[in-house]
Amino acid sequence: MSSGGLLLLLGLLTLWAELTPVSGQDRPVKPGLCPPRPQKPPCVKECKNDWSCRGEQKCCHYGCIYECRDPIFVK
């Protein structure tokens, strides 16, 4: 396979992996809540959703900041 064809295939696979399911069903949200943010750093987009974070971490949204954080659990 030519390098151009390989790059096209890689691009299509990347695009496919980023798309949500056609059925409209998103993955369920992970349990727990995001802890409060202690300070205000510059805008960062570390994640898109809970499933772009490792393990049990959640994708937490603080204004223009999206970052993976360990969840807190409230009784």
Curated annotation (Swiss-Prot):
User: What organism does the record attribute this protein to?
Assistant: Pseudechis porphyriacus
| Disulfide linkage | C34-C60, C43-C64, C47-C59, C53-C68
Q: Describe tissue expression.
A: Expressed by the venom gland.
Location of the protein in the cell:
Secreted
Domain (WAP) spans: 27-72
Please give a single GO biological process term from the UniProt record.
innate immune response
For this record, an example GO cellular component is: extracellular region
Function according to Swiss-Prot or TrEMBL: Damages membranes of susceptible bacteria. Has no hemolytic activity. Not toxic to mice. Does not inhibit the proteinases elastase and cathepsin G.
Q: Which N-terminal residues, if any, form the signal peptide?
A: 1-24
Question: Which keywords accompany this UniProt record?
Answer: Antibiotic, Antimicrobial, Disulfide bond, Secreted, Signal
Which GO terms label this protein's molecular function in UniProt?
serine-type endopeptidase inhibitor activity
Q: Which family does it belong to?
A: Belongs to the venom waprin family.
Q: What is this protein called?
A: Porwaprin-b
Which Pfam families would you find in this protein's record?
WAP
